[in-house]
Amino acid sequence: DDEYYKLILPIQKNLSKKFRANRNSPQPYIVLGALENPTIDKLSPILEKILKPYKKFKVELCDSVCVSETTKTVNLKIEHIGYIRKISRVINDTLKLHGFNILNNDEDELAISLANVNYFNKDKKNNSEVLYDSNKNNKTYPTLKVDRFEIWKISNSRRETLIKSYPLRNF
C-alpha cells in the first residue's frame, strides 16, 4: 500500500546505506514463490480464483534483518505471519495441483525485500539489530498493509517487469 510505504521508507534508506545497496531500491515486496516458465494465460485465471475471497490485510515487521545470497536482497523479517502464510500455502498447493513448477517454497522465512545488493560483506550477513525506537515495555513495530498481489518477471538483465496485478477486496 502506498500510504504504508511512507512508514517503511526511512528504514529502507537506512538499510540501503548500511549494506551499500543500489540507490534505486524497489518498492518493498514479499516474495511468496517463484515459478519456472509459467504460462501466464493459464496462471492468471487460477490466481484470480484463489485470491477472490481474500481481503486487504496487515503484516507486522520485526527488527531482524537478513541478507539473501540467492536473491541478493536485504530483507526485513515479518512477525505473526499466519494470514499471509495461509494465502501462500493455498497459492502454492493449488499451483502444484495445476502442474506449475514452484522453485523456492520457503514458507517459514517470509520477509519484506527492501534493497538489492551486488556485494555482500560477510560480517553483515544475518545481522539482527534494533531498527525502531520503541518503549522497552511496550515494543510495537510498524505494520504494513498488503492491498494487492502481483506477478513479476525478472529477466537476465535483473530488470523487474510487472505482468499482472490482483487487488484485494476492502474490509
Predicted regions and their residues:
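A structural detector for beta-sheet-dominated domains
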Residues: E60-C62, E79, D147, W152, ...
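Glycine-rich beta-strand-turn "strand-cap" elements at beta-sheet edges
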Residues: S64-T70, L144-R158
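Short hydrophobic/aromatic beta-strand or adjacent loop that forms the aromatic wall/cage
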Residues: T73, A111, V146
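Generic preference for hydrophobic/aromatic residues in regular secondary structure cores
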Residues: V74, I151-K153, I163
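Generic detection of short hydrophobic beta-strand segments and adjacent strand-loop junctions
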Residues: L76, L144, Y166-L168
